[in-house]
Amino acid sequence: MGKVYVFDHPLIQHKLTYIRDKNTGTKEFRELVDEVATLMAFEITRDLPLEEVEIETPVSKARAKVIAGKKLGVIPILRAGIGMVDGILKLIPAAKVGHIGLYRDPQTLKPVEYYVKLPSDVEERDFIIVDPMLATGGSAVAAIDALKKRGAKSIKFMCLIAAPGRVKAVETAHPDVDIYIAALDERLNDHGYIVPGLGDAGDRLFGTK
């Protein structure tokens, strides 16, 4: 059964405040998203299995622990999810990176899949799907659907900000997926944006409107 984790780490909350601030410029916004992604990745990888190996320090031989050969994959939902990838790869540089392209139909607010590119060994990998926002929940559900349809067995979802009621929608659709969130906000407005949120994450990351 999947779980929902909301991070209350002071560094994450501090940086998230400046990510939200409308006066934060594109360069600083990118850097902050990258930093928060790294901090969240530290927590999300807490359950990685370890195995013992023998090494030799400058002083003596010793038994030490390393990650037990786990294959990981990071899957950003285009385009805003790209801003979180490098922060995660700083901690797990051997992870493969795939991409899922979804856009939200402005009329129906439902996701439309337009691009999927994944590592060839999908069934063997533990995947982390990343997207700064979990608003309606439609994109998260569609991205998880896309991975499962192609054989993925182990999936986690990670976002910066989520709307409370919509987290439940993802849980209901995919009860086996753990969800990791930096902040739960108040609600969605009539246009499907999270309030207070941070605006359009893609536009703020890439300097577009």
UniProtKB/Swiss-Prot annotation:
Gene3D superfamilies: 3.40.50.2020
Pathway connected to this protein: Pyrimidine metabolism; UMP biosynthesis via salvage pathway; UMP from uracil: step 1/1
Gene Ontology terms for molecular function: GTP binding; magnesium ion binding; uracil phosphoribosyltransferase activity
InterPro entries: PRibTrfase_dom (IPR000836), PRTase-like (IPR029057), Upp_B (IPR034332), UPRTase/APRTase (IPR050054), Ura_phspho_trans (IPR005765)
Keyword entries, A-Z: Allosteric enzyme, Glycosyltransferase, GTP-binding, Magnesium, Nucleotide-binding, Transferase
Domain of life: Bacteria
Catalytic activity: UMP + diphosphate = 5-phospho-alpha-D-ribose 1-diphosphate + uracil
HAMAP family: Upp_B
Protein name per UniProt: Uracil phosphoribosyltransferase
Organism annotation: Bacillus caldolyticus
Gene of this entry: upp
